């Protein structure tokens, strides 16, 4: 493991049997897993390069059980890591050897659908795609659609503020969540927002969405649902260079056109996807844009014409528009399968997640190719071009000594480049453990200290998902008093209070 996690608390480990018995009293039946063999599936999330067995796994089924588990752990100084489906690509659900892994998979019911108010109330273990499937017979859907939507859960989406291919027009999770029920580390249950469109007081709902499981455990989510557009068509636009494709993205948005989705892939990704899905992608191009327009038929036809004119000016070598709903879905099936497709051409890959201003796409793509040559590792680029959210897939072989370290260094340089050109370290995958030690590249010590003060207002003992997001010490009394550089403190052996 290349990342450093908090040192296990020997006192907690010595009380393991006592803790397990207490948790079994709160979550009876098969809700507590404590054997190594049965805990093995929980040792990592989607960032499988890092693995660690938890001390114990707890699978509650009710808000009362979640409250009981957290209250007990708070009183007895036991760390807790919440987990949805374990699809996080930043190590956000990486367990702790002296902590409880709190799995929310049993919270899998859609409690209510209110078509008149256009909201649905769901439990956090419901998968993203299941929400849309429950609505589609009535012509509605849930807009955020991460590539992992068949597996990722709404609770995990809230934790990471997930987006997807249609977030350019319809927003991230934070733009589509209206209310939450959440359990604090003390066991207290609070409600934020609701079916109404606004709430008085501080925007705590906005603070919790994207907080990566550091502030509380979500047990219910009220989401906004949308009616399907009258018409939707997708365009495949090929270019001879990635720079031309990146320039076209900026031109389309600059013309005042906001597509339903705008994705980009480079040559390695195009070939991997086409071999895997047979989506009809052109193989003689260096970069491919997928642009979707939705709305009234006349508006869609008009926008397609405008985009065709822009692509000609930008040097597109091919432009094709879907002629049926089946073909539109096939275009998107290729993009949705990009990650597993790339997984077929390399033993391992390391997926990055930075966001940049759209106008910087050509520069960043060129610099990424230079970094690829520097580190001697191939990279396949797949990303949400419309909002500048990059997902470079760094190809490596973990069986070769040193390749994971090179992939990590390559990825860190990409993220530093994103910040350098005015972007941010993450778009939708979260910070987790993966980007934790890069936070000082983007935030000052004062920035990070203020964020930790907010964390301490929700979790005064620092027991909820520790070791994630912040590259500094986790105790509230030390905030602002310890110099941190590159995630390390001076005199680390000095006892802390």
Residue ranges and their predicted role:
Residues 1-71, 87-118, 267-278, 324-351, ...:
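N-terminal flexible segment immediately upstream of the FAD-binding catalytic core
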Residues 90-108, 136-140, 163-174, 221-227, ...:
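A glycine- and small-aliphatic-rich helix-loop capping segment at beta-alpha/alpha-beta transitions
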Residues 33-43, 223-227, 233, 238-241, ...:
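C-terminal substrate-recognition/cap domain of FAD-linked oxidoreductases
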Residues 109-263, 464, 481-485, 489-497:
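FAD-binding subdomain of flavoenzyme oxidoreductases
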Residues 28-29, 419-431, 454-456, 460-467:
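Alpha-helix capping/hinge segments and adjacent helical runs
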Residues 188, 437-497:
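Activity-critical C-terminal alpha-helical subdomain
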